[in-house]
Amino acid sequence: MKTRSRHLAKVVGALALAATLAACGSSSTAAVDSDGLTKLAVGNFSANTLTFPYVIANEQGLFKDEGIVTETVNAKSSAELTATLIGGSTQMAVGTPENVMAAMDQGQGLVAVAPFGKIDMALVVPGDSSITDVKQLAGKQIGVVQRGTFSERFAREILAQNGVDPEGVTYVAVGGGVTMEPALRSGKVDATVAATSSVVLIKSHGLDLKALVNTMDGTAGAVGEYGLQTFWTTTDAFKQANPDVVQGFCRAMAKATNWIADDVNRDAGMRSLEKLLDVSTENAGHIWDQVHTSWSTSIAAEQWQKNIEMTLGAGSTAVPFADHVDTSCK
C-alpha cells in the first residue's frame, strides 16, 4: 500500500506538470514541413536500450518512408515523458507501465501503441556473495533504481513468487548502472535490480555478478513471461485527428522491430548500440544478444490485464484493453 501511495503521488505531480504544459503545445493536428513531411515530436529516453527500435527506425530511414520527420524530445524520467505527452509538447512518446497505466487510471485519454518491450530486469548479487537463491534475500537490502518505481515492483513480484514477504526486505534507491555499481561494491546493498545494459557495464569494470533471476533467460517465472517494460503512447485526441500519422509511426516502428529481431543485422545493430550507449564493441555484442528479440508488434488482452494488475493492484479493471490499446498496427 505504501508503494502504491508513493507512486500515485508521483503520478499526481506528473499530471499537474502536464496541465502546465498544455498551454505550451497542442496535440490535435500534426504540422507539415517544407518538404511535405509530417512533423512529429517524439518523447524519448536518450542513451537507453529501451527505445532501440526508435533509434533504428530513424537510422534506417523508416519514418521518412512513411512521410514522417521526427523531432526527438529527450526526457529525464518516464513521468516527464508521460506529462509532456499529455501536455501536448509531444505527439508520441515511449512510456512505462508505472506512469502510463497510472495516468490512464486517473482518467487521462492515452493509447498504447506498438512496439511493446519485454521486461528487461534481473535480480543480481556480486559473484562472491554467499546468496544463491531468492529465498535468502529475506531481511536483506535490495537496490532499486528509485523507491516506488517499476524496479521495486519487479523485486516485490519476484520475492512474492519465491515465498519471501516483500515487506521483509529493505529497498534502497541506488540509481542506474553508474551509481548502482558502487552500492554493490561497498556492500550498501546485498542485491540489486538491474537491466541487461547495467549488468554488462558493471561486469566490464571487473565486478563479477550472478543473476538469481533474469527475465531474459526464463528464470524469472511468470513476471518474465508477461511483464512489459515499455510501449509507445499517444493521446486519443491526436490519434483521432491524425490516424494516418499514427499508423505511419507504428508501421515504421514495426519494421524496426523486425529488423532488430533478425540476427543477420547483428553487426549493424552492434554499431548502433555502441553509439547509443557509448560502450565497446564487445559489450554492444553482449547487449545485442540479450535484447534483440525483446520487442513485439502486438499484445494480447490477457497480457495487458496482467500488467495492469501488477502496476495498479490485483483485480483492477479501470484500464480496459479495448479502450487503451491500439490493435490496428501490423
Language-model-detected regions and their locations in the chain:
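Secondary-structure end/capping motifs
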Residues: 239-314
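C-terminal motif of bacterial Sec signal peptides marking the signal peptidase cleavage site
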Residues: 19-23
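Conserved C-terminal helix/tail region of periplasmic/extracytoplasmic solute-binding proteins
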Residues: 308-330
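Pocket-lining segment of extracytoplasmic ligand-binding domains
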Residues: 98, 172, 178-272
